[in-house]
């Protein structure tokens, strides 16, 4: 795991590098990675590496154009745009050969045994069809309102590490353990997360925050907030109404 924003990306690729895989949008911080720049660096290095982009968190929130991104492969998932769970899509640039991970059938271009889940595929297509510019703008409006409200509290800090997607916010409740705040918010029907779902059972410091230079205190006291297309400004106001009571109800673990 490396931070491609720190200027040292080139030292990780050489003539033995066959694949570079990166997120378009980090799922803990909302940070947008400069994937077009990474594609250029790989090409100029002369390395034989293919570039794979995990665009799961970008779909529906940012433009996803495989030509302008310069990728060889790209993956997205339906559930992030209110489509069915368990179905995704893999883009493979013409000329790139992909070998199957499992064998047993040739009917689906010899990539997977069995048959694709046609109803889920249709559901994914329908969800894509329903996406519009107004959805992305709505998320931007929610993000702006959230950041404005957060400035009203001296113990709440929005962690912005660079260019940012509009639907994921990483915030620090200074002095209060993120896990304690998470469970406190749950009592009011407000559900957040500490880190990504992929590492929800890990007690270690977030690798994403560490790579971006966050110290242990910041990582311990941070939560991830994410918005859906159906969230409202009123719900954000309710969130901060509950947060205002944190100093009266929780013990500070850092001074």
Question: What is the predicted function of each stretch?
Answer:
Residues 1-255:
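Pyridoxal 5′-phosphate
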């Amino acid at each position: 795991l490396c931070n491609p924003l720190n200027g040292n990306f080139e030292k990780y690729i050489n003539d033995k590098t066959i694949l570079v895989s990166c997120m378009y949008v980090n799922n803990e911080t909302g940070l947008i990675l400069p994937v077009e720049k990474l594609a250029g660096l790989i090409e100029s290095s002369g390395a034989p590496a293919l570039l794979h982009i995990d665009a799961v968190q970008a779909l529906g929130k940012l433009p996803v154009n495989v030509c302008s991104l310069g990728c060889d492969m790209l993956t997205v998932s339906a559930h992030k745009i209110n489509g069915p769970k368990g179905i995704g899509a893999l883009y493979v640039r013409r000329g790139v050969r992909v070998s199957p991970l499992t064998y047993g059938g040739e009917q689906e271009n010899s990539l997977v045994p069995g048959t694709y889940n046609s109803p889920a595929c249709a559901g994914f297509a329908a969800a894509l069809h329903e996406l519009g510019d107004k959805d992305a703008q709505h998320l931007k409006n929610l993000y702006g309102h959230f950041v404005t409200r957060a400035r009203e509290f001296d113990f709440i800090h929005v962690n912005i590490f660079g260019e940012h997607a509009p639907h994921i916010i990483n915030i620090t409740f200074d002095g209060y353990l993120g896990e304690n705040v998470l469970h406190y918010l749950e009592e009011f029907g407000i559900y957040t997360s500490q880190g990504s779902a992929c590492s929800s059972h890990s007690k270690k410091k977030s690798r994403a925050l560490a790579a971006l230079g966050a110290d242990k205190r910041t990582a311990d006291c941070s939560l991830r907030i994410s918005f859906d297309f159906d969230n409202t400004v009123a719900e954000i106001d309710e969130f901060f109404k509950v947060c205002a009571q944190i100093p009266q109800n929780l013990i500070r673990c850092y001074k």
